[in-house]
UniProtKB/Swiss-Prot annotation:
UniProt-listed InterPro entries: Furin-like_Cys-rich_dom, Furin_repeat, GF_recep_IV, Growth_fac_rcpt_cys_sf, Kinase-like_dom_sf, Prot_kinase_dom, Protein_kinase_ATP_BS, Rcpt_L-dom
Organism: Rattus norvegicus (Rat)
Annotated active site: 847
Protein name: Receptor tyrosine-protein kinase erbB-2
Domain Protein kinase: 722-989
Length: 1257
């Protein structure tokens, strides 16, 4: 027989309890076209399996049935779970008139749910030539109720007598979603078939009679439903119905598509556990059901395992173990720790492909009590396999199965050693569960063996399947076993044939049951093979009586079993010796009695469990143990005549010796401790001296981050060096003054902006303004505002460079009629360069907008306002804000929704800033509340294209506003793009009536207000003072006026390659002007002035044509190629009233050259900014927003004063809305003062552009 026949799994193996829906369920078979193992009992096997069966949980295989066989036991079958095979039969008809559905969970040849093959007469040719003889073979299918095949096709071949197979409309039988439905029908027949009965309107039938007309339930449906009961639109069946219905409800189905729950078709069985939404608990569902095949059952059938997910299975899932309850039900339970090792048999785990038990795998079963799988012994087991090097299995190796008690699969034996006359190696086997069946039908198969008896004396259960015992010529005792007591359902039976006749040969040979076996039931000869004893059982042997009154050892009787008494029990002659097997259940003690137990001797110095105190007892005259008067605990050597410890009297010599020894040990211990202390002190002193001399140890272990050191310089100013001129603005945390910085010991005046905190400001505000100073001090770019210094008075004062033209937003609004395309694109280039520099030093700005860009000159802008800026550490790529008010309309979508700020979120803000410039200061999303911005952005809406922008410029804005931050351009790419556009500005920005002639100097209201102030003349620009240029100061024409004459000169420098250009705005009185191409020795300043410093002068002289020669380095035709050092910047066409401005090609400054005079220390080029060490991580590892301080004092540079406002030393807070900085609202309201009473702008709390991240948007 093939291996597949021995190792096939039986599909489902048990009978449902009769009370479950009244449906009888039976197992199927899995033999395919193989010959039956016992042709003599084959028909009986089919009858036992399918008698009264309605649902076949497996395959219905009808093969090799003779012509005269009665198959009436098939008439109740209504449903087949697997496939149906009718092959090699000689019967004319198969009575399956009630079969409605074939589910096809298993398929014949992996394709067919119905196969009808070679059902013919073996002598078909002889019958055809013999007059009057009708050939045998299948003539009609008569599957008149079959209306559904869920999966699989139809194969009909080799049936010469079969009719009507081509008259069936198979399309109607197949489910519409049956993707695997091949139809292979052979219509070659040797007889003429009559037509369908006239009652068959559609001429589709299964047989000749009117009852065999095919019932159509699919192709006749008019409304597109899967099944229906008629042709009307109202005749549709429920979607959970299969095979048709009698009405529209899911309780009117003839069969269920998925699961049958008490006669109602459902998609799923009710869950065992439900969720209570009121108590938020998982609760047991009293209506829960287990899934068993296509049915919902309250409990799993016997021999099946219930799982936690509500299914009935044959094998537990991984990390689960089988558990048997007291009532016999079995379930799978999850292991609390790694599951215990189990023994696997054939068909399981590593033995899944093994054919039989061999000498190569038999040792794996040593010591096993339960085998998960099956056992099969074939001729090759004992013959060996020389080709694969497997030796024959020796009889003594079979002793490993003597400990076996349970098999979950089947036991198949077709070969056995001749030296063994029985199967006594399985003498302790109690259960064969049969979850896996041989051929899908047999749990126990014994065939062709030379044994004389079975010897399975402990076998008490065959959980499922049939027992087949045949062709064992010497086997007796087959009929002496009560097989009915071993079976668990009525479909089980014993099939036997070809064994030794019991009535003559077995009896005559004395092979009968022992007289002590009850009812003549036994597994073999002798009193040890009885199924049950007629009298008593001692161990494994039946006896007539127990040794209660006589014999040794004495016994007591419990449930007709003879059990021995305890050895310390005294045998009694006229009464029972004991009442149990314990020492306290004796009638009398053989030696002594301690408490209630009989003992061989009384305890003498015995320590009880978990006790360190010994117990001493002695026996009295009656043999009862009594406690000794002295309970010795140690050195118990002297005992009295009773065995108790004698009283110990201490000797003086012993006391003296013990005292002397104790004193000596104490002295030795003192000496040792003293020596150890001295040596320890010497070692400490030695190690201290070595450390002081060498000092090679580090206090902390090195964890280099790879970051560059931040060598920025912080200038500390004295309050006496600062002179406040007028108030520029006030806010909740302080006041911004226009002032003059006069360094000690120098006759120099420098215009500055001074930010002073209020007197009652909290320490947090002082810390935050120092953090802002840290950020500003670390930047060194011509396009980023620079910090000049701080004054550490009682309230910290921040000193920054004064920008005379105010913020870029006000500038473009005021001069919108005079701005050209070149101005706008140059500003875009400079802002992009400034942001690219901030990205290089890992600084996230978070508040880039036109209002936060200051105008130093009409050709030079700088990024400012670092109140919200954040430095990223060396291992950080993004910043997460904790709260605070932020400019919603300038922010990227991920920053609004997830508080995530990166350099790419600054790119979004840059796009909005460019939009502001191109619309001359229009408000983004004007009229739309800030809270609606996230939804608007998620829906894909963006700012519209400005009228002056070409599609090239607008597409760059759109790229900046991509949802995916990685899809946005980098700042270095934006620099390249806008530099390219700046070379040909009118091609990309179209301004109507743009003046192509020389532009006039653009002044501003703010600029004029600064010039009108007193003491603002004869000032020196801050950057010129901090980084003097060689040749900048002209020689003093007269000694008396030399101290101030040079201050009227202004210059501009740009770094190109390694040199620096300077351009004097006024010719020297003593000689020709310095060549503008001459290198400056002051190059390399950390803060590099790359603009044309307009200065706050009282007048500017026009340049001579000779002085304009540096301007010719730029081509008047922007389409011509430019030198690389121009970096895409195009100078104005006519610059006589203005100084030249040249962009620098790289953001990071070059190393400084050695100046002629002393200079303040500067930070090396390329220094990396670091996060302040005082920052501590907050919740979830996110650094708290220590820069959340936001108010007017955050941005003093671009605050525009109101015209005509007086400047008292401490004026009342009457200021422009710009001074209050409407775009900010501080998080901590307790630290703010009351808002100004005469504030004329929009209150900060109502500003729509800024919204707190701590408020859900």
């Amino acid at each position: 027989m093939e291996l597949a026949a021995w190792c096939r799994w039986g599909f489902l193996l048990a009978l449902l309890p009769p009370g479950i829906a009244g449906t009888q369920v039976c197992t199927g078979t899995d033999m395919k076209l193989r010959l039956p193992a016992s042709p003599e009992t084959h028909l009986d096997m089919l009858r036992h399996l399918y008698q009264g069966c309605q649902v076949v949980q497996g395959n219905l295989e009808l093969t090799y049935v003779p012509a005269n066989a009665s198959l009436s036991f098939l008439q109740d079958i209504q449903e087949v779970q697997g496939y149906m095979l009718i092959a090699h039969n000689q019967v004319k008809r198969v009575p399956l008139q009630r079969l409605r559905i074939v589910r096809g969970t298993q398929l014949f040849e992996d394709k067919y749910a119905l196969a009808v093959l070679d059902n013919r007469d073996p002598q078909d040719n002889v019958a055809a030539s013999t007059p009057g003889r009708t050939p045998e073979g299948l003539r009609e299918l008569q599957l008149r109720s079959l209306t559904e095949i869920l999966k699989g096709g139809v194969l009909i071949r080799g049936n010469p007598q079969l009719c009507y197979q081509d008259m069936v409309l198979w399309k109607d039988v197949f489910r519409k979603n049956n993707q695997l439905a091949p139809v292979d029908i052979d219509t070659n027949r040797s007889r003429a078939c009559p037509p369908c009965a006239p009652a068959c309107k559609d001429n589709h039938c299964w047989g000749e009679s009117p009852e065999d007309c095919q019932i159509l339930t699919g192709t006749i449906c008019t409304s597109g439903c899967a099944r229906c009961k008629g042709r009307l639109p109202t005749d549709c069946c429920h979607e959970q119905c299969a095979a048709g219905c009698t009405g529209p409800k899911h309780s009117d189905c003839l069969a269920c598509l998925h699961f049958n729950h008490s006669g109602i078709c459902e998609l799923h069985c009710p869950a065992l556990v439900t969720y209570n939404t009121d108590t938020f608990e998982s609760m047991h569902n009293p209506e829960g059901r287990y899934t068993f095949g296509a049915s919902c059952v309250t409990t799993c059938p016997y021999n099946y395992l219930s799982t936690e997910v509500g299914s009935c299975t044959l094998v537990c899932p991984p990390n689960n173990q089988e558990v048997t309850a007291e009532d016999g039900t079995q379930r799978c339970e999850k292991c609390s720790k790694p599951c215990a090792r189990v023994c696997y048999g054939l068909g399981m785990e590593h033995l899944r492909g093994a054919r039989a038990i061999t000498s190569d795998n038999v040792q794996e079963f040593d010591g096993c009590k339960k085998i998960f799988g099956s056992l099969a012994f074939l001729p090759e087991s004992f013959d060996g396999d020389p080709s694969s090097g497997i030796a024959p299995l020796r009889p003594e190796q079979l002793q490993v199965f003597e400990t076996l008690e349970e098999i979950t699969g089947y036991l198949y034996i077709s070969a056995w050693p001749d030296s063994l006359r029985d199967l006594s190696v399985f003498q302790n086997l109690r259960i064969i569960r049969g979850r896996i069946l041989h051929d899908g039908a047999y749990s126990l198969t014994l065939q062709g063996l030379g044994i004389h008896s079975l010897g399975l004396r402990s076998l008490r259960e065959l959980g499922s399947g049939l027992a087949l015992i045949h062709r064992n010529a010497h086997l007796c005792f087959v009929h002496t076993v009560p097989w009915d007591q071993l079976f668990r359902n009525p479909h089980q039976a014993l099939l036997h044939s070809g064994n030794r006749p019991e009535e003559d040969l077995c009896v005559s040979s004395g092979l009968v049951c022992n007289s002590l076996c009850a009812h003549g039931h036994c597994w073999g000869p002798g009193p040890t093979q009885c199924v049950n004893c007629s009298h008593f059982l001692r161990g494994q042997e039946c006896v007539e009586e127990c040794r209660v009154w006589k014999g040794l050892p004495r016994e007591y009787v419990s449930d007709k079993r003879c059990l021995p008494c305890h050895p310390e029990c005294q045998p009694q002659n006229s009464s029972e010796t004991c009442f149990g097997s314990e020492a306290d259940q004796c009638a009398a003690c053989a030696h002594y009695k301690d408490s209630s137990s009989c003992v061989a001797r009384c305890p003498s110095g015995v320590k009880p469990d978990l006790s360190y105190m010994p117990i001493w007892k002695y026996p009295d005259e009656e043999g009862i143990c009594q406690p000794c008067p002295i309970n010795c605990t140690h050195s118990c050597v002297d005992l009295d005549e009773r065995g108790c410890p004698a009283e110990q009297r201490a000797s003086p010599v012993t006391f003296i010796i013990a005292t002397v020894v104790g004193v000596l040990l104490f002295l030795i211990l003192v000496v040792v401790v003293g020596i150890l202390i001295k040596r320890r002190r010497q070692k400490i002193r030695k190690y201290t001296m070595r450390r002081l001399l060498q000092e090679t140890e580090l206090v902390e272990p090195l964890t280099p981050s790879g970051a560059m050191p931040n060598q920025a310089q912080m200038r500390i100013l004295k309050e006496t060096e600062l002179r406040k001129v007028k108030v520029l603005g006030s806010g909740a945390f302080g006041t911004v003054y226009k002032g003059i910085w006069i360094p000690d010991g120098e006759n120099v005046k420098i215009p500055v902006a001074i930010k002073v905190l209020r007197e009652n400001t909290s320490p947090k505000a002082n810390k935050e303004i120092l953090d802002e100073a840290y950020v500003m001090a670390g930047v060194g770019s011509p396009y980023v505002s620079r910090l000049l210094g701080i004054c550490l008075t009682s309230t910290v004062q921040l000193v920054t460079q004064l920008m005379p033209y105010g913020c870029l937003l006000d500038h473009v609004r005021e001069h919108r009629g005079r701005l050209g395309s070149q101005d706008l694109l140059n500003w875009c280039v400079q802002i992009a360069k400034g942001m690219s520099y901030l990205e290089d030093v890992r600084l996230v700005h978070r508040d880039l907008a036109a209002r936060n860009v200051l105008v130093k000159s009409p050709n030079h802008v700088k990024i400012t306002d670092f109140g919200l800026a954040r430095l990223l550490d060396i291992d950080e790529t993004e910043y997460h804000a904790d709260g605070g008010k932020v400019p919603i309309k300038w922010m990227a979508l991920e920053s609004i929704l997830r508080r995530r700020f990166t350099h790419q979120s600054d790119v979004w803000s840059y796009g909005v800033t460019v939009w502001e410039l191109m619309t001359f200061g229009a408000k983004p999303y004007d009229g739309i509340p800030a809270r609606e911005i996230p939804d608007l952005l998620e829906k894909g809406e963006r700012l519209p294209q400005p009228p002056i922008c070409t599609i090239d410029v607008y597409m760059i804005m759109v790229k900046c506003w991509m949802i995916d931050s990685e899809c946005r351009p980098r700042f270095r790419e934006l620099v390249s793009e806008f530099s390219r556009m700046a070379r040909d500005p009118q091609r990309f920005v179209v301004i109507q009536n743009e003046d192509l002639g020389p532009s006039s100097p653009m002044d501003s209201t703010f600029y004029r207000s600064l010039l009108e102030d007193d003491d603002m003349g004869d000032l020196v620009d801050a950057e010129e003072y901090l980084v003097p240029q060689q040749g900048f100061f002209s020689p003093d024409p007269t000694p008396g006026t030399g101290s101030t004459a040079h201050r009227r000169h202004r210059s501009s420098s740009t770094r190109s390659g390694g040199g620096e250009l300077t351009l004097g705005l006024e010719p020297s009185e003593e000689g020709p002007p310095r060549s503008p191409l001459a290198p400056s020795e002051g190059a390399g300043s950390d803060v590099f002035d790359g603009d044309l410093a307009m200065g706050v002068t009282k007048g500017l002289q026009s340049l001579s044509p000779h002085d304009l020669s540096p301007l010719q380095r730029y081509s008047e035709d922007p389409t011509l190629p430019l030198p690389p050092e121009t970096d895409g910047y195009v100078a104005p066409l006519a610059c006589s009233p203005q100084p030249e401005y040249v962009n620098q090609s790289e953001v990071q400054p070059q190393p400084p050259l050695t100046p002629e005079g002393p200079l303040p220390p500067v930070r090396p080029a390329g220094a990396t900014l670091e996060r302040p060490k005082t920052l501590s991580p907050g919740k979830n590892g996110v650094v708290k927003d220590v820069f959340a301080f936001g108010g007017a004092v955050e941005n003093p540079e671009y605050l525009v004063p109101r015209e005509g406002t007086a400047s008292p030393p401490h004026p009342s807070p009457a200021f422009s809305p710009a001074f209050d900085n409407l775009y900010y609202w501080d998080q901590n309201s307790s630290e703010q003062g009351p808002p100004p009473s005469n504030f004329e702008g929009t209150p900060t709390a109502e500003n729509p552009e800024y919204l707190g991240l701590d408020v859900p948007v």
